C-alpha cells in the first residue's frame, strides 16, 4: 500500500507538471483516472471513473479571479478510493469534489508562503543577467511551491485511507447549528 501511495503521489505530480511539457492536458480527469487505474491494476475502471469526473470538472478553467477546484488530486484520490473499495462512480464524485476543493486551499497556501522566496531570487538573477538562475528558480519554485504539496497530499491521503479522509470531511463540513451558538 505504501508503494501504491507513493506512485499515486507521483501520478498527481506528473499531472500537475503538465505545463512543463506544454499544454498537454495531462491534468484532465480522463488522463489522471487512467493513470490511477494503471497504478492500481484496473485500467478500465480508472478510465470510466476518469470520464465520470471529467464530466464533473468539465469547464473547470480559471477565468478572471475564479479558481476552479484542484481536479488532479480530486481525480486521483476519488478514483483510487473507488477502485480499492469496489464502489460505483458516485463514490468517485463524492470523494473527488471535496478533496479537490480542500487541496486548492493547500495549493494556494504554497503559492503564498513557499513560492515568493523563489520569485525574489529569480528577480535577483534577472537583475544580474543570469538566465540560468531564473530558469532554475522557475523549476524549483514550481516543484516546491505547488507540485510537491499536491504529491504529498495525495500520497498521504491514500495511505491514511478512506476512514481518515472521511473523518477530515466530517470535521471540516460539520458546522454548528444556530441553536448551538
Regions found by a protein language model. Give the residues of each.
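Helix-loop-helix junctions within the multi-pass membrane cores of secondary transporters/permeases
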Residues: 94-172
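Hydrophobic transmembrane alpha-helices
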Residues: 1-73
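Single conserved hydrophobic/aromatic residue that forms the stacking wall/gate
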Residues: 173-181
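Alpha-helical membrane segments and immediately flanking helix-loop junctions
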Residues: 10, 49-56, 63-77, 81, ...
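Membrane-water interface at transmembrane helix exits
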Residues: 15, 19, 41, 53, ...
Amino acid at each position: 500500500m505504501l508503494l501504491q501511495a507513493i506512485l499515486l503521489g507521483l501520478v498527481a505530480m506528473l499531472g500537475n507538471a503538465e505545463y512543463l511539457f506544454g499544454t498537454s492536458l495531462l491534468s484532465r480527469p480522463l488522463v489522471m483516472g487512467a493513470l490511477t487505474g494503471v497504478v492500481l491494476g484496473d485500467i478500465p475502471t480508472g478510465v470510466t471513473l476518469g470520464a465520470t469526473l471529467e464530466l464533473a470538472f468539465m469547464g473547470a478553467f480559471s477565468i478572471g479571479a475564479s479558481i476552479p477546484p484542484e481536479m488532479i488530486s480530486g481525480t486521483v484520490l476519488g478514483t483510487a478510493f473507488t477502485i480499492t473499495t469496489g464502489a460505483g462512480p458516485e463514490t468517485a464524485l463524492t470523494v473527488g469534489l471535496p478533496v479537490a476543493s480542500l487541496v486548492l486551499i493547500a495549493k494556494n497556501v504554497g503559492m503564498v508562503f513557499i513560492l515568493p522566496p523563489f520569485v525574489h531570487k529569480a528577480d535577483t538573477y534577472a537583475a544580474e543577467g543570469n538566465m540560468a538562475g531564473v530558469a532554475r528558480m522557475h523549476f524549483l519554485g514550481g516543484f516546491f511551491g505547488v507540485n510537491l504539496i499536491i504529491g504529498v497530499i495525495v500520497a498521504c491521503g491514500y495511505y491514511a485511507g478512506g476512514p481518515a479522509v472521511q473523518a477530515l470531511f466530517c470535521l471540516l463540513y460539520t458546522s454548528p447549528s444556530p441553536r448551538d451558538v
